[in-house]
Structures are given as C-alpha cells and as structure tokens.
Amino acid sequence: MGRAFEYRRAAKEKRWDKMSKVFPKLAKAITLAAKEGGSEPDTNAKLRTAILNAKAQNMPKDNIDAAIKRASSKEGNLSEITYEGKANFGVLIIMECMTDNPTRTIANLKSYFNKTQGASIVPNGSLEFMFNRKSVFECLKSEVENLKLSLEDLEFALIDYGLEELEEVGDKIIIRGDYNSFKLLNEGFESLRLPIIKAGLQRIATTPIELNDEQMELTEKLLDRIEDDDDVVALYTNIE
C-alpha cells in the first residue's frame, strides 16, 4: 500500500479527530434514524447503531438526546441522498449525504469538484457497479476473549447471521457481511452479548487503485473539501 496509503489514513484520522466536524454528522444520523423508526432505541435497530457510533466518538449524552428530539421538529426534515463523482488518476468517489436542503448540498459539492481540474460530478448510478455494499461491524478482541470465544468460535456463531468475512486488525475484530444482512448481524452480536464499538454500511471498491505520493496529495485536497462539508456523512473512493 505504501506511503500514499499511510498518508491518506493519517490525514483522514486527523480530520475525524476534529469533534466539531464529527458531531454534526453523527447527530444527523441519529435524527434520521429516529425519524424513520421512532425514538426508542430498544425497538429501532438503526437508531441503536447510530447512538452506538456516536458514543464511540465520545459524543455527550445531551447531544444524543437533542438529536433524537429533533426528529419530531422541523429541523428533523432530513433526507438521504447519494452523489457520485470522478477525479484525476482514475479516482472514483461516492458521497453519502444527509441534508435538509438538497439544492444547497449539490451546489456545494459541484463547487468542490469545479475547483479541481479534471474532476466532475457524474449522474447517479454511473459508479454504483464499481462498489460492493457491505455491512461492517467492529468489536474488541478482548470482549471476545471475555466471552471465552476463539475467533473460530465467533466466526461459526455469526455465519448463520450473515457473516462473510472476519478479520483481526490490532486489538479489534472486523466483521463483514452482505449489505442486506446488517439487521441480522446486529441481532447476532446481541444474541452473543458481544459489545459493538462501531457499525455501519460501507461501499468497498471492486477494483481498488494505487496512487503515488504526488497523486495522493493532489487528490487529498478534493477529498478534504468534501469530507469537511457537514452534509456529507460518508465518503468512499476506489483508492487502495
């Protein structure tokens, strides 16, 4: 993966450490989940997951409660929209947004692409086939060990809930499954009483590409602008 990958990862982690930017995105996910499925986490799996992800980023309880309450107000009039774009060097970009003003959102995104030579927004659906949608869960290896489970035991226990792949990364375990298995996998973790530290739906490129340091640095300028937009809650590329 090389230095370009390390640069990309370090830069992304640095950006997401800015809580002032993270919290609005997390709050929107909570508000939308509460709007769609009700304000009770016990009966709304999507809301439970949104709250779990917020807590993992140390979002205060007052902020979480306020985001849930917004679901029943005019501020809760959010919609989910996905936009797609291309950049230089064969880079493909998918942007998942939550917004109360789609006109503002697309205008902002177009301005970011227009400021980058060779980059452009493309019609929705143009890049969809270049990415696989996956359910992705993270848990701590120590929590698995506390349940007296080996990784093989965990894999066997979650296969019936839609597990496709299990990966050990440092002190964490990454579980991946089909996009449509998100709810089922969540139930699998609950049945095991295994705490989840992060969960979500991700898009994984079918044919990743590698960029050299110079290409990565140029591309990063566009990705920075996109990720700094409060309406953008998730950004996916085909960069390795």
UniProtKB/Swiss-Prot annotation:
Keyword terms of this UniProt record: Cytoplasm, DNA-binding, Transcription, Transcription regulation
Family of the protein in this entry: Belongs to the TACO1 family.
PANTHER family membership: TRANSCRIPTIONAL REGULATORY PROTEIN YEBC-RELATED (PTHR12532:SF6), TRANSLATIONAL ACTIVATOR OF CYTOCHROME C OXIDASE 1 (PTHR12532)
Keyword ATP-binding set for record: no
Gene3D superfamilies xrefs: 1.10.10.200, 3.30.70.980
Ranges in a coiled coil: none
The protein's name in its UniProt record: Probable transcriptional regulatory protein jhp_0149
GO cellular component, one term: cytosol
Molecular function GO terms recorded: DNA binding
One Gene Ontology term from the biological process aspect of the record: regulation of DNA-templated transcription
Pfam families to which the protein is assigned, alphabetical: TACO1_YebC_N (PF20772), Transcrip_reg (PF01709)
Localisation: Cytoplasm
InterPro entries, alphabetized: Integrase-like_N, TACO1_YebC-like_2nd/3rd_dom, TACO1_YebC_N, Transcrip_reg_TACO1-like, Transcrip_reg_TACO1-like_dom3, YebC-like
Cited SUPFAM superfamilies: YebC-like (SSF75625)
HAMAP family referenced in this protein's UniProt entry, alphabetically: Transcrip_reg_TACO1
